[in-house]
Amino acid sequence: MIPISRLRPGRLHKKSDPTSNWLIIFLVWAAGLGAAAQFGKIAVSLDEFRTIYSVGEVGLGFLISCVGLVGLVFGVAGGILIPLIGIRRAFVWGMFGAAMLSALQAVHLQYFALIVLRILEGASHLLIVVAGPILMARHSSVAARGAVMTLWSSFFGLSYMLVALIAPALLTLGGTSALFVAHAGYMCVLGVALWRVLPPPVVTDSAQRTKKPLDLATILRLHVTIYTSPWLSAAALGFVFYTGLYIALLTYLPDFVDTVQRTGLSASLPLASIVTSLTLGVVMLRFIDPVRAVIIGYVLIAVSAVPLIFTLGQDAVFIVACLVLLGATGIVPGASFALLASLNADETDRAYATGAIAQLGNLGTTTGPPILAAIIAQFGLSGTVAFVMLFSACGISIHLFLAGRRSKTMNQRD
């Protein structure tokens, strides 16, 4: 079995605090925008694909979700394999793989062939989203790390917004081929830039202890080890409730306002989350630890959901209430990614924890929307508020439970 370091809290590791390399940080973050666009480029092109493929809405939806299924199934495996490959190498491979696959998708293929390429693209996506936050933490100072990880957490929502703004012109210019070629070029250019600026890896004890043959039994045992560890699992077990909430609310809240208002609300909701994340979220992490920040975030989400009940039917006020609610969600993702570094000082452990967050993050995005859809069908808006409060309570409870386990373990060592 692969051993995992037991002294994870950062205060137990006396290391010099390097200055932040902002060039690398912003390039890695820009690469994250491109990784999120692997979903967004299909989402904004569904009308085009309806004219190309006669597969129904479920089949079209699978063009989007099949990329996430790779992370759902192989998230932890990615966290195991990436340290073996090398963090830098895995990230650059992911970028070039994404560029190549996006270029191949620019050719009008049969539906099944496109699905195969999308699944392979999911593997490149996994390499990027697991290695990315590790590189961000590696090249940031301890003082700046909370802000840096919050910046990383914004990549998904911001990318969707940017793709929605840029894609229409590209689709008008040359259809999906133009959009996919542009995405391929973006990933290739960034891949070259990162290959040039990322320093070569330094072999550490952490890397040496993972240089062991892997088999299915070892991978399954490591799944158990990760999800029973209060350090390795904390970020992922708290994050899954956020992703379930966030995507579900983005999908269904606009349905509660007049049709004329829906497009504007759909575009504004992720922006509210991003603004809060990059302002209040960053400030909070300067003064309180990430676990408390996540808990505060979930409390604010639960409280912010209540006004929805009293403002339904008053679209202007209801829209403000929706923006406040989505703004409250912006605290949780940055604090959750900051947990990866604060609870796991060892880079191999960070890779394992990041693999878990990729796995459970995809679980949340996959299950949250259909759960909320079923609740709305039976209970309407009141069910939506109950859904938000339940998921928030689960996020708070799991973090309190895991914090208690970590405290008990540390007291036993003392």
What spans do the regions from the language model cover?
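Conserved MFS/SLC helix-loop-helix module at the cytosolic interface between two early adjacent transmembrane helices
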Residues: 73-109
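C-terminal transmembrane helical hairpin of 12-TM major facilitator-type secondary transporters
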Residues: 291-336
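A late C-terminal transmembrane helix in Major Facilitator Superfamily
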Residues: 342-381
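Juxtamembrane intracellular "pre-TM" segments in multi-pass secondary transporters
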Residues: 8-18, 199-234
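Extracytoplasmic gate region of multi-pass secondary transporters
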Residues: 42-43, 231-275
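Helix-to-loop junctions at the C-terminal end of transmembrane segments
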Residues: 74-86, 277-290
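Cytoplasmic helix-loop-helix junction between adjacent transmembrane helices
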Residues: 117-156
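Helix-loop-helix hairpin linking two adjacent transmembrane segments in secondary transporters
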Residues: 142, 150-199
